[in-house]
Amino acid sequence: MRDRWPVPRRAGAVIRTNLEAGRRPLETFEDYVFYCDLMVNDGRHTYDGADAFREIIQHYPGTILLLNLRDREAWITSRLRHGHGEFARREMAARGLSDEAALTEAWRTDWDARLSAVRAHMADRPGQLVEFDIDKDSPADLVAALPRYGLNPEDFHDIGNSRTRRLSPLMRRLKAEIAHRRPRFFGK
């Protein structure tokens, strides 16, 4: 989701607010087909809308959950680097953790618990859980798992993959400054 769309940039905040108010999780933007980037963190509170998968399935019983997988430790490393460390700092503050080691252990626990919970909850819903390993599976595998959407594997490419990108020292510094200083408006 992007700001130019008629949906708030942080869908996770909308999901959290809706559930707190007793509404359906995706109320106000139910016409969309795909939802992602459901994490909200302002340094005081952290909420991952992906944890609302039970409520989403309850209110939208035909939903297909796409569970993106990758090596857990690579995922943690990526999160630690996200926003030049700003995301990890906000997560530590919101969780009341004092060091990166405690945060990485919390993320390991979260990862294992979510995988187990999603798989258990979806066990009796064959065809509604699609697991996609971003390191091993191809776009063609994803397209094959979602035939009714008429997807084209050529439309999928890696956006946001910075593992192999090399920036000049000036660009690295500018990106870090922007990541640490940009205003964040997440509501409560």
Model region roles, listed by residue range:
Residues 28-57, 68:
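Glycine-rich phosphate-binding loop used to anchor ATP phosphates in small-molecule kinases
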Residues 98-188:
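PAPS-dependent sulfotransferases, especially Golgi type II membrane carbohydrate sulfotransferases
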Residues 1-5, 89, 150-157:
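Short hydrophobic/aromatic-enriched beta-strand-loop microsegments
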Residues 26, 56-58, 119-123:
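N-terminal cationic-hydrophobic initiation segments that often serve targeting/anchoring roles
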Residues 50-109, 128, 140-144:
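PAPS-dependent sulfotransferase catalytic domain
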Residues 2-3, 34-37, 64-69, 130-133, ...:
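A structural signal for short, well-ordered beta-strand segments and their strand-loop junctions
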Residues 1-32, 38, 165, 171-180, ...:
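PAPS-dependent sulfotransferase catalytic core
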Residues 19-22, 46-54, 108-116:
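Well-ordered, non-membrane alpha-helical segments in soluble/globular domains
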